[in-house]
A protein has these predicted regions:
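Conserved acidic segment of CheY-like receiver
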Residues: 5-15, 20-24
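Helix N-cap/capping motif at the beta->alpha junctions
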Residues: 35-48, 71
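His-Asp phosphorelay/catalytic-motif detector in bacterial-type signaling
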Residues: 55-59, 84-90
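Active-site residues of response regulator receiver
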Residues: 63
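Receiver (REC) domain active-site loop signature in two-component systems and cognate sites
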Residues: 66
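Alpha4 helix (beta4-alpha4-beta5 surface) of REC/receiver domains from two-component response regulators
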Residues: 73, 86-89, 97-114
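A Lys-centered signature of the CheY-like receiver
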Residues: 117-118
Length: 129
């Protein structure tokens, strides 16, 4: 049984997204996984969900380095969504390396819960759930 009803991966790395979705289903972490290749596609889709009165995913796994709209730009726009519609969403930044500068910057965003290192594993997802 899934622990999370819905989550979202925002990352331009198709290989990472595919493997993470597969892992999530294998361990029963989440059944409904949305994937967006850049921040603009994600913000447009999430706003569309709200327009249709569909709640936002409970968890967002966000890469920082993407074309079009990167993770930081996504976070800026995400803050424009009314607080009552986003306050239960946990954002986890996912990155291939830990940058002290990025970790410090992430603390400026109330929605950011933690900074995770790629690839995500069953153990790292257990800590999220």
């Amino acid at each position: 049984m899934s622990r999370i009803d819905s989550c979202c991966i925002i990352d331009d790395d198709e290989f990472f997204a595919f493997n993470t979705k597969k892992l999530m289903k294998q361990i029963g972490f989440c059944e409904n996984v949305l994937w967006y290749a850049d921040g603009q596609e994600a913000i447009d889709s999430l706003v569309g969900l709200l327009i249709e009165n569909i709640p936002l995913p409970e968890i967002i796994f966000l890469d920082l380095n993407m074309p079009n709209k990167d993770g930081w730009a996504f976070l800026e726009e995400f803050q424009n969504i009314p607080k009552h519609q986003r306050e239960n969403v946990k954002v986890y930044i996912v990155s291939s390396f830990v940058s002290p500068e990025n970790m410090a910057k992430a603390h400026n965003y109330a929605s950011v819960t933690a900074y995770l290192v790629k690839p995500l594993t069953a153990e790292s997802l257990e800590k999220v759930a």
